[in-house]
Amino acid sequence: MSPIMDALVPMVVEQTSRGERSYDIYSRLLKERVIFLTGQVEDHMANLVVAQLLFLESENPDKDIFLYINSPGGSVTAGMSIYDTMQFIKPNVSTVCMGQACSMGAFLLAGGAAGKRYVLPNSRVMIHQPLGGFQGQASDIQIHAQEILTIKQKLNNLLAEHTGQPLEVIERDTDRDNFMSAEQAVEYGIVDAVLSHRGA
């Protein structure tokens, strides 16, 4: 976060038996097993999310973790480090889309624990094929193009597994940017339900 954004993060003061204790709002929510994945998916952000997932597993391996996503997407390798950790750890990771989950954000949303993937009513979800850019010698460009196709196949297979859609449907629907409303994301199988109100 930038210094300006750091200054804008609210602090929460708690009374304890030893006096007052103050936390930034994200640290306080981490105590409630809530992690925020916001903005571009990149290596630094992915490392922070992975560290929080591992920490919460060590705190209580049997209690669900809640991952709130508002992301336009980003790096496939950074996203896969988060995805693999979500699948690896013992606690179920419940995913919640607020705002948008596009590209790798949508993939991580779908990768939450089955039956525990949610979207807020006015959020949007977008899936597409991975993007890549490379310049250099023709032979190196060919190597990188083949790697992008391999990654595309892997992501499509995993998305088919998490959504229950046939692979050929995933391949067709990710060929171009494919935007979905909250209800369409439920119908497609990326999430399990639209959350409009917190339960009583």
Swiss-Prot record:
It is an enzyme of class 3 (hydrolase). GO terms for cellular component: cytoplasm; endopeptidase Clp complex. The keyword Hydrolase applies. Keywords: Cytoplasm, Hydrolase, Protease, Serine protease. The keyword Coiled coil does not apply. Its EC number is 3.4.21.92. Fourteen ClpP subunits assemble into 2 heptameric rings which stack back to back to give a disk-like structure with a central cavity, resembling the structure of eukaryotic proteasomes. This is ATP-dependent Clp protease proteolytic subunit.
